Amino acid sequence: MEHNGSFRVDSEFRYTLFPIVYSVIFILGVVANGYVLWVFANLYPSKKLNEIKIFMVNLTMADLLFLITLPLWIVYYYNEGDWILPNFLCNVAGCLFFINTYCSVAFLGVITYNRYQAVAYPIKTAQATTRKRGISLSLIIWVSIVATASYFLATDSTNLVPNKDGSGNITRCFEHYEPYSVPILVVHVFIAFCFFLVFFLIFYCNLVIIHTLLTQPMRQQRKAGVKRRALWMVCTVLAVFIICFVPHHVVQLPWTLAELGYQTNFHQAINDAHQITLCLLSTNCVLDPVIYCFLTKKFRKHLSEKFYSMRSSRKCSRATSDTCTEVIVPANQTPIVSLKN
């Protein structure tokens, strides 16, 4: 653990914001992603999963890995940025944060490319055996990102800073960079470059998909519902990227420069923006399951059946209650015949 007594800006609103946002995301994310896994486990035999469903299962696993660390971050921010847990848990939380972020980017990228191929080259895609490719690509993504993230497990990512009143020290987690560190700057530049490369590829593929769907001759168009769902899927993937990932990566490099001491004029404003983008980044765990509704027919059918059965049970419950009210009358009065049909 390093002692860092140098002045750093802080955004104190995060100690209220993060516990609330992370608590909501934890509850919704665990329910949504747990349900997705349950659906895949019960409706799809593992040997019959095609390429895109393999990517979806892996994306769900990446989201769950991050979600299990949220209680650690909630405790951290509730204690106003003091890591009171064992130091190794800070490393684990940071490692899984990195894995979730870039596995999500990678799997959303390959899902988009899969849909691009299906629209741009439908015959070739229909004839291709994609299950093995899906497994191979998933392994490559996991191995490369986990290997990169393992760096966080090998180093102590905590540091000591004075508390507000100066009476002692508190332990920060992933909040310290060596001043003017060139290697750290190079790493962040490389990460930003890779992210925006993937983002522009996804943006291009989605534009091609939208253009193809909107300009198909009437005789080649599928049913209106299928086309509408395909367009919604494209819009949802773009929305997840633009809402969750783009703001963080736009702010991350200027924030890194400020933290390293290269640019301090707008340090406070950049730090405030960085906290907000971290919240937005975590919402991908809740938004990812929405994509599955537009990608998988069985998933939509199962979800609509469950929703219909819940509505039916409520109606039956109300009908039973109304029936009981009509039947139970005082003994000295003549029952009134209901006019309901």
UniProtKB/Swiss-Prot annotation:
PROSITE patterns according to UniProt: G_PROTEIN_RECEP_F1_1, G_PROTEIN_RECEP_F1_2
Induction context: By lipopolysaccharide (LPS).
Segments passing through the bilayer: 17-38, 55-74, 92-113, 134-155, 185-205, 234-254, 276-295
Superkingdom of origin: Eukaryota
Gene Ontology biological-process entries: chemotaxis; inflammatory response; inositol trisphosphate biosynthetic process; phospholipase C-activating G protein-coupled receptor signaling pathway; response to lipopolysaccharide
Residue numbers on the Cytoplasmic membrane side: 39-54, 114-133, 206-233, 296-341
Assembly, per entry: Interacts with ARRB1.
Function: Receptor for platelet activating factor, a chemotactic phospholipid mediator that possesses potent inflammatory, smooth-muscle contractile and hypotensive activity. Seems to mediate its action via a G protein that activates a phosphatidylinositol-calcium second messenger system.
Family: Belongs to the G-protein coupled receptor 1 family.
Protein name stated in the entry: Platelet-activating factor receptor
Source organism of this protein record: Mus musculus
Gene: Ptafr
